[in-house]
Amino acid sequence: MADLASRITKPDEAPAAAPEAAPVSAPASEEPKAPENETSIEESQSNLVKNEYEVEIKLSDLQNDTESPLYSVSSFDELGLPEAVNRGLLAINFKKPSKVQEKCLPLMLSDPPRNMIAQSQSGTGKTAAFVLTVLSRIDLSKPHQPQALLLAPSRELARQIQTVVQTIGQFCENLIVEAAIPGAISRETGVRGSVVVGTPGTVMDLVKRRQFDISQLKVLVIDEADNMLDQQGLGDQCVRVKNMLPKTIQILLFSATFPDKVLRFAERFAPNANQMKLKHKELTVKGISQMFMDCPTEKDKYDILCKLYGLMTIGSSVIFVRTRETANEIQKRMEADGHKVSALHGAYEGQSRDVLLDEFRSGRSKVLITTNVLARGIDVSSVSMVINYDIPMKGPGEREPDAETYLHRIGRTGRFGRVGVSISFVHDRRSFEALSQIAQFYGIDLIQLNPNDLDDTERKVQEVIKSSRAQAEYVPSATDSAV
């Protein structure tokens, strides 16, 4: 890989060493890929069976059960899904399982139920995988008895997962899916659905108020599990929720990223779990052309952003910033300069956030400025560009590059076999070293854009966005052995 620092236009500034890739054991290779969430869930499957990348499947009982070899399925018919679920898959044009579905579903649907920790790239069908498991486990003759609980880090993602369950389960008679998010559950009736999708805090409140009968829950799903289990507050809430649930519950943990520290905790949270892992360098999607712009100063970032506005509106675009204040400031300045943009972050009330995201999904709003509240899981099929206005950082004083958040941010584009562009702004030694470390960690070559040659930038970006074929194959590993 050509080193980012060698191509960045700042002399005398070498990047710090990249963090080492976490060691993993041995891989098992294969093929496919598929959707993760709402809206474009109906459009995807025809592109999904072409991709090949290596995975590692670790069966917790591999040494004890020699008669249960790892196997995969080549069609949904082989899974023995309920007829109504198969009809739902056909209605949304899901013809063959993606890689994560092909590998995980036979394990998650086995009896007796086993826990699962699954890692797969953004936009490859994780949501559909756990939704199919949920719909196969619940008893539809008890529509008002909660039987499956799906937790997400934000109301936006919870609402989106709710829509996916309803879409795939559209032919499941008596299926009731409720969102356990602030303001959604009536105090008078409480939770009355067989599938409940929510955020941990609201779920805990409902249980404490005796408005959520958890006694017959069969499945617990945690989406974006690395973030949910690692984030202070959310992690504690997840543990408390789990401790309230029946001991026999099946636990499914899904995310695109699982840092070692979080994975160790996840293995305790979901004991004896089957696992699906990927190599670090298989985590980014080739369909996303990853670029960077070396801005002369921090102030120049805004001017360059405005010059890119025409490109941002070819499809839809998401601009990620570090703080709510920055989001508000950019929105005001861009609107004053005659550009139509929206901003969404945690300071907005829940219903306002719902309206803003719905407007963005529908295309009424095409440029959305946001914080990391939308970095994970959100699926809007029209997003063709992601801009990292601020490089994601973490740790005390935000001095450490946040490679996981970078991956989740850029994963808002290039979904389900489509192409997309991500452009990261750097302006000083700290920001370009951070981006360099992220690039080295994932083994990616970033394309440099010249801030003084917007014609060339336009050509490079349009080449990708207007491409007639979405070649979203996964980045091959640097070697054939496991990292």
Curated annotation (Swiss-Prot):
InterPro entries reported for this sequence: DEAD/DEAH_box_helicase_dom, Helicase_ATP-bd, Helicase_C-like, P-loop_NTPase, RNA-helicase_DEAD-box_CS, RNA_helicase_DEAD_Q_motif
SUPFAM superfamilies associated with the record: P-loop containing nucleoside triphosphate hydrolases (SSF52540)
TM spans (from-to): none
Ranges for domain Helicase C-terminal: 304-455
GO molecular function terms attached to this record: ATP binding; ATP hydrolysis activity; inositol hexakisphosphate binding; mRNA binding; RNA helicase activity
Main location: cytoplasm
Compositionally biased spans, kind Low complexity: 14-29
Membrane topology value: Peripheral membrane protein
Annotated ATP binding sites: S120, Q121, S122, G123, T124, G125, K126, T127
The protein's Enzyme Commission number: 3.6.4.13
Domain Helicase ATP-binding: 107-276
Catalytically driven reaction(s): ATP + H2O = ADP + phosphate + H(+)
Chain segments carrying region Disordered: 1-47
PROSITE patterns from the UniProt entry: DEAD_ATP_HELICASE, HELICASE_ATP_BIND_1, HELICASE_CTER, Q_MOTIF
One record GO biological process: tRNA export from nucleus
Pfam families associated with the record: DEAD, Helicase_C
Motif DEAD box mapped to chain: 223-226
Motif Q motif: positions: 74-102
Subcellular location field: Cytoplasm; Nucleus, Nuclear pore complex; Nucleus membrane
GO CC field: cellular bud tip; cytoplasmic stress granule; nuclear membrane; nuclear pore cytoplasmic filaments; nucleus
Key words, A-Z: ATP-binding, Cytoplasm, Helicase, Hydrolase, Membrane, mRNA transport, Nuclear pore complex, Nucleotide-binding, Nucleus, Protein transport, RNA-binding, Translocation, Transport
Task of the protein: ATP-dependent RNA helicase associated with the nuclear pore complex and essential for mRNA export from the nucleus. May participate in a terminal step of mRNA export through the removal of proteins that accompany mRNA through the nucleopore complex. May also be involved in early transcription.
Subunit structure: Associates with the nuclear pore complex.
Record family assignment: Belongs to the DEAD box helicase family. DDX19/DBP5 subfamily.
Official protein name in the record: ATP-dependent RNA helicase dbp-5
Upper taxonomic lineage: Eukaryota, Fungi, Dikarya, Ascomycota, Pezizomycotina
Gene: dbp-5
